[in-house]
Amino acid sequence: MPGTSVSDLSTATAVDAPALLPLPVARPSAPAVVRGKLYIKTHGCQMNEYDSAKMADVLAASEGLELTDNPEEADVVLVNTCSIREKAQEKVFSQLGRWKALKAGGKPVIIGVGGCVASQEGEAIVKRAPYVDLVFGPQTLHRLPELIRARRESGKSQVDISFPEIEKFDRLPEPRAEGPSAFVSIMEGCSKYCSFCVVPYTRGEEVSRPFEDVLVEVAQLAAQGVREINLLGQNVNAYRGAYGADAGDPAQYADLGLLIRTIAQIEGIGRIRFTTSHPLEFSDSLVDAYRDVPQLANYLHLPVQAGSDRILSAMKRGYTALEFKSRIRKLRAVRPDISISSDFIVGFPGETEADFEKTMKLIEDVGFDQSFSFVYSRRPGTPASDLQDDTPETVKQARLARLQAHISAHAASISQSMVGSVQRVLVEGPSRRDPNELTGKSENMRPVNFPGNPRLIGQFVDVLITEAMSNSLRGRIQLDDSAH
């Protein structure tokens, strides 16, 4: 953020985080005059959730638009799209078709399409759905006010799917906390070009936010009561944030390990997470951060995608199953009880039964706690889309069911093993199942429900786990310090 800095960063190393001088304190912004309503429909990943929140911030600050959960009362209606899954485009046009009626009777509703499908399709969206007013990519959401004004003044649809580096972060308003946990985007894009993935084409290559900018945003959120920070990026552990150049010295670069160490020094931050990471960038510096930083959650999401070296090579992942396991061994040497989740693609073109068995062997060897697993979905324009895919869909679905059942059973055993333990839980709010109870998450991402005073919301509490349910844990607040 222009005009702000963290002083004396020139001596920072991957081992010693720079000593922080007082960071800028977040001051409440003057509330914008409400001049209309905004509806946003979000599909896809946590990065999209973050981007949607920033869209709302930008339009509240500049246009006085207030969020609504009813598109029929909105003056601006946006869909933030995801292109990871098959038929993503058709789902978007189906959504737009339903929204076309919002303009009935000449109502001047602005309809906009953002996100990765917008980046892929661009002008084609307006050609197919001429009632769409705005098409904008993930890197141009900060230009929404300009696009809306241009649309209203010219009467023509506006399309901007350019990749202006990291400019969008420089032009976003001060972050607004909405609860004790917050996402902070630290980088955009991916330069790995896995053969199945559209991200480099829809979000561009890797670009990291400056080190100081990230720290200022975290400090502002902490001053508003945020206690847990989740650092976001398509390939978050490739982060290389520049610092030091303002003092006239050549820029230096902070990796994710150093960023975590420094965030841990910010008053109020009690837990740090990050997602999503790539095994190629899982460095010793990051392992050392797990060793040294107690605020770093005892949980890691590290997508492996497959356990067969032949399939990993076809996916262009850049590592073998043995190399992946080596990284996990290093991590467990410093965090023996860490929970690890992963992503898996089943039925990648050319996957044989032997290949799939190697994936199952890897799952058994690593002991994954949770997974996001899917049957391979062909994405047009990616190298993998040209590969011959002759595995029957029924076989793919059977493999997926077997993989998911195995990981679910292991996750259930981990949950059961937590009964009788004391877990540190960040209280997020009332439980959805019982408003008289509170809910939060354990370090390994399990929802925990327990009786408690609503005044505890936003605080960390120790909870004695008394029961493991299918998708959550139950417990009671542990008041006896001797339990540690």
UniProtKB/Swiss-Prot annotation:
SUPFAM superfamilies: Radical SAM enzymes (SSF102114). It catalyses: N(6)-dimethylallyladenosine(37) in tRNA + (sulfur carrier)-SH + AH2 + 2 S-adenosyl-L-methionine = 2-methylsulfanyl-N(6)-dimethylallyladenosine(37) in tRNA + (sulfur carrier)-H + 5'-deoxyadenosine + L-methionine + A + S-adenosyl-L-homocysteine + 2 H(+). It holds the Pfam family TRAM. Keywords: 4Fe-4S, Cytoplasm, Iron, Iron-sulfur, Metal-binding, S-adenosyl-L-methionine, Transferase, tRNA processing. It is an enzyme of class 2 (transferase). PROSITE patterns: MTTASE_N (PS51449), MTTASE_RADICAL (PS01278), RADICAL_SAM (PS51918), TRAM (PS50926). [4Fe-4S] cluster 1 binds at C45, C82, C116. Residues 176-415 form the Radical SAM core domain. Binds 2 [4Fe-4S] clusters. One cluster is coordinated with 3 cysteines and an exchangeable S-adenosyl-L-methionine. NCBIfam families: miaB-methiolase, MiaB/RimO family radical SAM methylthiotransferase. This is tRNA-2-methylthio-N(6)-dimethylallyladenosine synthase. It comes from Xanthomonas oryzae pv. oryzae (strain KACC10331 / KXO85). The lineage of its organism: Bacteria, Pseudomonadati, Pseudomonadota, Gammaproteobacteria, Lysobacterales. The gene is miaB.
